[in-house]
Amino acid sequence: MGCGNSTATSAAAGRGPTGAVKDTTEDSITEDDKRRNYGGVYVGLPSEAVNMASSQTKTVQKN
């Protein structure tokens, strides 16, 4: 089927354990994944916007 496995049984046997491992790793999102570029569309906040937001929250605090 084009995925490198010659028989359907070996492909089905390989999907069980790897699928379970894949699900657990998708839950942990790294900083790199947050800033990933999908087909020319930027996903995530640029560092300038993050710095702006953090500096604004600091000035809002009153004693």
From Swiss-Prot:
Source domain of life: Eukaryota
Region (Disordered): 1-39
Official protein name in the record: Overexpressed in colon carcinoma 1 protein homolog
InterPro entries named among the record's database cross-references: OCC1
Polar residues: compositionally biased ranges: 1-10
Any Pfam family: OCC1
Similarity-based family: Belongs to the OCC1 family.
Disulphide bond pairs: none
